[in-house]
Amino acid sequence: MKLVIVSGRSGSGKSVALRVLEDLGYYCVDNLPLPLIGSLLAQLKSSNDLVAISVDVRNIAEQGKVLEQQLALLPPETEISSFFLNSSDKVLLKRFSETRRLHPLSRSQMSLQEAIKLEGRLLEPIAKMVDHHIDTSLLNVYELSDQVRQILLGSVDKELVINIESFGFKHGMPTEADFMFDVRFLPNPHWETELRPLTGLDVPVQEFLARQPLVHKLIWQIENLFETWMPHLERNNRSYLTIAIGCTGGQHRSVYIADQLAKRFANGKHVVNARHRELGDVKA
């Protein structure tokens, strides 16, 4: 089992780091009481071997000592990585002022600046224990995400899930699509009597559409579009991409195009899911 511990001063980007971990498949728990670490891992052992927790000033009581004790009790095969995120006092003050969020220690009679300084002192025991320190003072959300991925994976690239869905316009458009292509202008197998009862997954329909130059050109252009822009979509903190292909009834043209695109995108780098809505969720 792998355990990642994320700590740091409020406003330094812990929530961003947790989102990255969640996208990587980690079961994330924010502000877990430290004595519960062992119980959490034992409970998740059979269902999830990737776990991430955040530790912050809200469960402060002798954190460093308690954390050290809890980690010593974990099974020896547990792989532990830890991060401490920090920013300069000036940057943290600016971030809290801009977002108008309440600092966890501001409920007492102290100023925001005093709360920020006190939090830094309280978290010093944790900061001395961790493997990786990240100063986020000059980082934006995307740069911080890349750094976390780089440390965990050895690369800033992440596995983008591509969902390709065929549908029929007469049954309504899918609401979850990021990109939608209307292929109703392509030659329609519906008008071929012997092809009408078949679908775009059947060989006779595939052979019919494969003979159409317009079909080849469209597939090539869609593939080229995403090959060009996919790296930029991946760097934009995106975990999945949904591409919808629509024809009139969702039986022939859209099914064939979606099926062909799924095969072309399945190059090992991406997880590709093909769904044909009007065929009762049949997978390609």
Curated annotation (Swiss-Prot):
Keyword set includes Thylakoid: no
Positions that bind GTP: D56, V57, R58, N59
Span of the signal peptide: none
InterPro entries: P-loop_NTPase, RapZ-like, RapZ-like_N, RapZ_C
Nucleotide-binding keyword on record: yes
Keywords annotated in UniProt: ATP-binding, GTP-binding, Nucleotide-binding
Ligand binding (ATP): G8, R9, S10, G11, S12, G13, K14, S15
Molecular function as annotated in GO: ATP binding; GTP binding
Family: Belongs to the RapZ-like family.
Functional summary from the UniProt entry: Displays ATPase and GTPase activities.
HAMAP family per UniProt: RapZ_like
Protein name, as recorded: Nucleotide-binding protein Sden_0486
